[in-house]
């Protein structure tokens, strides 16, 4: 795993600036989103010893979440544990939402969520604007989600993968560089679509 020391990722302002340029040509148009060519600065993940990671799980993912949190702290990360805190039955949307909210607000740089399959938590997290959650089950999906999709939340299925593989996925996911270049244009389109529908929802709410 790459040491927590290294170059920093693009700032939220830089990412928002790129998205805003895309939005200018999308909102109010019936045409598919168009993004400008170009890429944000190349970055290495993670950035520094102050990198803060939110973790969370339901009851099924609780044991694995605890182990991942311990290993992250050993590696020098600051960890915010959003629960759950026991084996008692709970609903995964509550904890997936808590983790995603910490990432979306900027309080935490990344999030890791564990449930039975990693799918439901990803669905919940991706409802939160600004979050790009990816369920990963091997090293290839971990690399792809970071390099190609600029994922900022990782979801894992405790019922599908063992503890050793889960930690390898976390290590890989945190160490892979965001690819930028052609991927930046595509991720900007994802963000543009998100903002387009957010604005539509706001107009309906204020109707």
PLM feature segments, named:
Residues 90-111:
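N-terminal small/polar loop signature for handling phosphorylated ligands or for N-terminal nucleophile
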Residues 51-57, 82, 113, 154-155:
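Short glycine-rich or small-residue beta-strand-to-loop segments that form or flank ligand, phosphate
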Residues 51-79:
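Glycine-rich phosphate/diphosphate-binding loop of Rossmann-like nucleotide-binding domains
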Residues 2, 14-21, 45-48, 138-207:
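C-terminal binding/interaction regions
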Residues 78-89:
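A short beta-strand-loop structural module common to alpha/beta enzyme folds
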Residues 76-79, 131-138:
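Short hydrophobic/aromatic-enriched beta-strand-loop microsegments
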Residues 1-50, 75:
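Protein-protein interaction and targeting regions used for scaffolding, dimerization, and localization
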Residues 113-131:
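Compact, glycine-rich, soluble single-domain proteins
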